[in-house]
Design a protein with these regions (language model features):
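Class I (Rossmann-like) S-adenosyl-L-methionine-dependent methyltransferase catalytic domain
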Residues: 1-40, 49-85, 89-95, 138-215
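Conserved beta-strand/loop positions that form the S-adenosyl-L-methionine
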Residues: 46
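A short acidic, Gly/Pro-enriched loop at the edge of an enzyme's catalytic core
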Residues: 96-106
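GHKL-family ATP-binding catalytic core of two-component histidine kinases
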Residues: 97-99, 116, 174
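A short SAM/SAH-binding and catalytic strip from SAM-dependent methyltransferases
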Residues: 104-119
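Intrinsic-disorder/low-complexity, polar/charged segments enriched in Ser/Thr/Lys/Arg/Asp/Glu/Gln
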Residues: 112, 134-136
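A short glycine-rich, Lys/Arg-flanked "PGG" loop and its adjoining helix->strand segment in the class I
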Residues: 121-133
Length: 215
């Protein structure tokens, strides 16, 4: 698919080189510190990018597996964070090569809003599979108010899903979208927030989800 190749090329151009001392965490995960502290299973950081969240989990003493579709991102993770259990390069559309019920936490920070609806549900099913019963998924996704980062721009392929000028897919969520896509989890927290990691203000939905225990 052209979108997959375009996405890979784009992110490899972004994740060129990082130095650990310049990698910063922001405070969005602090809300979940009690959950993080009590987590005994490994943590999966999907779409790890430069390693902002990987760093946060490492500093909390967690066993982290970091993943990204960009080989440059993974090379930087391996260079900057030798503490990680593993750093794996794969596209989420290919599925997740992990055992069932393996992770206590999955972190998807700005990495789940690049897919068509059917693919998004497939990825979320994979995340539920690899989470332990009662495990947690921490998410941030684009808001429909995220105009500084392309909200409403490009060709609309599905409601709130756009094909951008560089040939990538980009989805923007309202609260109804957020609750619909994540309805197979228990939604513990869902709030529209502003984040300031980048040069311009970004608007996101921050969501805390819990995998349901069967039976």
């Amino acid at each position: 698919m052209d979108e997959v190749k375009n996405s890979e090329l784009y992110w490899n151009s972004i994740h060129v080189d990082y130095v650990r001392k310049n990698i910063k965490t922001d405070d969005w995960l602090e809300r979940f510190d009690a959950i993080i502290t009590n987590c005994k299973n490994p943590v999966l950081d999907i779409g790890c990018g430069g390693g902002n969240d990987t760093l946060y989990f490492i500093e909390k003493g967690k066993k982290v597996i970091a993943c990204d579709q960009s080989i440059n991102a993974i090379n930087n993770i391996q260079k900057n964070f030798p503490e990680v259990v593993a750093a794996k390069c794969f596209n989420m559309l290919e599925g997740f090569a992990f055992e069932d019920n393996f992770f206590g936490i999955v972190c998807a920070d700005l990495s789940l809003h690049y897919f068509k609806e059917a693919d998004t549900y497939m990825i979320l099913n994979e995340i539920r599979r690899i989470l332990i019963p009662g495990g947690y998924l921490f998410v941030r996704v684009n808001s429909i108010k995220d105009t500084n980062f392309g909200a409403g721009q490009g060709k609309e392929l599905e409601p709130h899903l756009y094909k951008t000028e560089n040939g990538m897919l980009k989805r923007f969520f309202d609260e109804e979208d957020t609750r619909r896509f994540f309805s197979d989890f228990d939604i513990l927290f869902c709030e529209e927030q502003k984040m300031f990691r980048y040069s311009s203000e970004k608007v996101v939905f921050c969501v805390d989800l819990k995998a349901r225990v069967c039976g």
